[in-house]
Amino acid sequence: MNRPWLAHYHRATLTIISDSPAPTGGAAPLSAPLWHQLQLVGSVLVAIRAGTSGTAAFEAVDPALRPGVQALGFRVLRWLGRAEALRRQLAKRTPPPPADALLCTALALAWRAEDSPYEPFTLVDQAVEAAKRSPVTRAQAPFINACLRRFLREREALIATTDRELVAQWNHPRWWIERLRRDHPRDWQGILTADNAQPPMTLRVNVQKVAVAPYLSALSAINLVAKRVTESGVQLARAVPVRQLPGFAEGEASVQDAAAQLAAPLLLDGLGRAAPLRLLDACAAPGGKTAHLLELTSAAHVLALDADAARSRRIGETLDRLGLADRARVLVADAARPQAWWDGTPFDGILLDAPCTASGVVRRHPDIRWLRRESDIEQLAMQQAMLLAALWPLVRPGGRLLYCTCSVFRAEGSHQIDAFLAHNTDARLRPSPGHLLPQSTSDVRGVPDNDLGDHDGFFYALLEKSAR
């Protein structure tokens, strides 16, 4: 089946979108009637159910209305399994897609009364109003009204009934839940709980421009509470638009999850930060890890590859803002075909941030769980293996390759590396984190002593080539 949305989400580095108002800058959110916002969320849900990525679906919304619609939409996507189970209890027949999306939107927003953004009666009233005001749902307005009024009357009993359904309880597809149970029998519930939580806003401080302690002081001076995480990261108590961050436009900080910030130091520390290193970032867009490598050493030069021209432009934009463009070369190329771009000189270090299911960043992209198919895992694992096989010969003897994915599935992590080591006797696994589970509190091997804080799911394996 052709699923064009897949291109948006098979990368380990993703554009971060958030529940919080306008985290990436722009104008202040414009208020709109709730019924209109519910219409827009319903339209986004229809698009996602048809195979459009959440990123693309939300980008189709008027930019002035997008922050509010996105905040509601993320909540709907996080509780969609429960909403669909409730709808099945309320309706003997499935309504047409626009009406079903609007009904599920209202149910997802209303079922948890303790943290609902609006009173349940208000949501019901405005959902019915939304149905009446659209020609595609007007005929179903009485049906939607009847279902939602019944939900208000029988709320506790209906929720108790759906509690017995695995998908309703955890709000992930059944195959996903069962896969996590096999892969992480002690941690699967914690992973799913983390997936349904709102992620923090974490920054990486550009230590080429400012140290972490002064940057924390600058945040405190404008009443932004933050704590230090990782070597050069800070985590905010609440998300804010980047335009409010001190020195953001001047390149003093970038938005990057704490787990993602481990990549650059893991690769560099074994090679020596003062050495004139030749580095490759094999799947580099949008450029955050390339930039971090350059921020941590002034002696390295990085070749940053990405097969997508539009995404490659974002690498350049990232490096320009941070003042690092003069020490990197950005190339549009397929990392799996080095014969088309490699000059024959081995690299001291390679960062392979491989295409993956992005199952570790579901809390930032809650649509992923509903778009993925279990067959995607096998397809992506094959692509990852091809990249490892193509890039390993490019590492000099004694050099290192850091393999990472933002996935919690073992097929894309530990199983992938076990297979690689079995077929490459010149490779050995250095101390590295392995599977970092979302909000994991377990001991992490190969991670600096600094607190990781609240982080996404990642996998890291640091491979060293035998010296001849």
Where are the regions a protein language model picked out?
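S-adenosylmethionine
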Residues: 1-468
